[in-house]
Curated annotation (Swiss-Prot):
Organism superkingdom: Eukaryota
UniProt miscellaneous comment: Present with 688 molecules/cell in log phase SD medium.
Lipidated residue numbers (GPI-anchor amidated asparagine): N232
Glycosylated residues (UniProt): N229
Alphabetic keyword roster: Cell membrane, Cell wall biogenesis/degradation, Glycoprotein, GPI-anchor, Lipoprotein, Membrane, Signal
Protein name: Cell wall biogenesis protein NCW2
Annotated GO CC locations: cellular bud neck; fungal-type cell wall; fungal-type vacuole; plasma membrane; side of membrane
The keyword Cell wall biogenesis/degradation appears for this protein: yes
Membrane topology: Lipid-anchor; GPI-anchor
Region (Disordered): 19-57, 111-143, 167-191
One of the GO BP terms on file: fungal-type cell wall organization
């Protein structure tokens, strides 16, 4: 009888302990659930705040791309010639500033011609003709230097040289006439026709402008001689010599 009482008491004690354990487990489970719920509630506001900040950043960046009020033309060294504002289908505005490019010289070649007609030819039975050409060189510096500043403030320098002139003898003739049997003073005339070219070149950057002027010049040289065909027939050769001398005078006059 006593043993049964002890066994019954033990069973009651075990049942009470198991009940307390189940209650504790339920409480722990409830506390864990509440903690997880609390953690979830703490994470959610943080994520929303980050999303709001990100969206705000994107919007502000987009606005800065379309703002044009803070652009002032006088911040440029040279103000724009014109401004073009374009708005696309999405409402974005693009501002484009345009400047006129500075003028540039194109290659130009100009030729002018002037001529002088030969004068005073004398006919004769003796004619001496010759042709020659002369070329001169010059080591002079440029004649002038032109400095130009365009609308952008850039400076261009143009240097001008006079190139050497060239003289070419087109025709040289000498003639004389004498009266047979008497003394006379015939004249020997020399005609020198030269073509003279004067050229100057202007350079500006990679552009070259050339101006060429061509003209003809005539020089008449006269040489007087005294001869007598009745006394010395050898004088016939002196006409040629005088003709050559006249040519030399004409060349010097150039």
């Amino acid at each position: 009888m006593k043993a049964c009482s002890i066994l019954f008491t033990t069973l009651i004690t075990l049942a009470a302990a198991q009940k307390d354990s189940g209650s504790l487990d339920g409480q722990n489970s409830e506390d864990s659930s509440q903690k997880e719920s609390s953690n979830s509630q703490e994470i959610t506001p943080t994520t929303t705040k980050e999303a709001q900040e990100s969206a705000s950043t994107v919007v502000s960046t987009g606005k800065s791309l379309v703002q044009t009020s803070n652009v002032v033309s006088n911040t440029y060294a040279v103000a724009p010639s014109t401004t073009v504002v374009t708005t696309d289908a999405q409402g974005k505005t693009t501002t484009q500033y345009l400047w006129w490019v500075a003028e540039s010289n194109s290659a130009v070649s100009t030729t002018s011609t002037a001529s002088v007609q030969p004068t005073g030819e004398t006919s004769s039975g003796i004619t001496n003709s010759a042709s020659s050409s002369t070329t001169s060189t010059s080591t002079d510096g440029p004649v002038t230097i032109v400095t130009t500043t365009n609308s952008l403030g850039e400076t261009y320098t143009s240097t001008v040289w006079w190139l050497p002139s060239s003289a070419t003898t087109d025709n040289t003739a000498s003639s004389s006439k004498s009266s047979s049997g008497s003394s006379s003073k015939p004249e020997s005339s020399t005609k020198v026709v030269s073509t003279i070219k004067s050229t100057y070149t202007t350079t500006s950057g990679s552009t070259v402008e050339t101006l060429t002027t061509t003209y003809k010049s005539t020089v008449n040289g006269k040489v007087a001689s005294v001869m007598s065909n009745s006394t010395n027939g050898a004088f016939a050769g002196t006409h040629i010599a005088y003709g050559a001398g006249a040519f030399a005078v004409g060349a010097l006059l150039l």
